[in-house]
C-alpha cells in the first residue's frame, strides 16, 4: 500500500488545486468605522450554469494513519470548506491525469483555516482529525451531474 507523508498547507503548495482561506498578513482594507479588517476576495466561486449555495456538512473524525480509497470531483463548480469550530483537518487532493486522479497529496489544514477547491479538482472526503466537525460549504447547485466518484488503490496518509 502506498504511504504518503502529509504536507503542511501553504498557498503555494495548494495553488494547483485551489485557494487557502485564511486571513492575509495585512487586511485589504478596514471597514465598519475601522473596527473590522476585510480580507477581500480570497477565492472565486465557480458555478458554471448554476447557483452558489451555502450548506453545513457535519463530518466524523478520522485518525492517523488515514487510509483513503475514494476520490471525487465536481466538474461544474468550485467547492469551499470552512471549519466552523476548532481543530486541524486533512485535505486530500489529486491532479487530473487524462480524466482520472493522479497521485494524491495530503495537506494538514490548521484550525480555523479553510480551502476552496477549483471546479474539477479530485479530492477526498472531509477528514477532521481531532473530533467531529461542522464545515460551512459553498458550492454549486444546478443542472447536470456535478459529482464524479472513483475508487483508487488505497493510499495511507500519515505525518
List each language-model region with its residue ranges.
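Ligand-binding loop in jelly-roll beta-barrel domains
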Residues: 120-136
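Conserved metal-binding segment of the jelly-roll/cupin
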Residues: 108-124
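Non-catalytic, conserved peripheral segments adjacent to functional cores
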Residues: 1-106, 130, 138-139, 143-150, ...
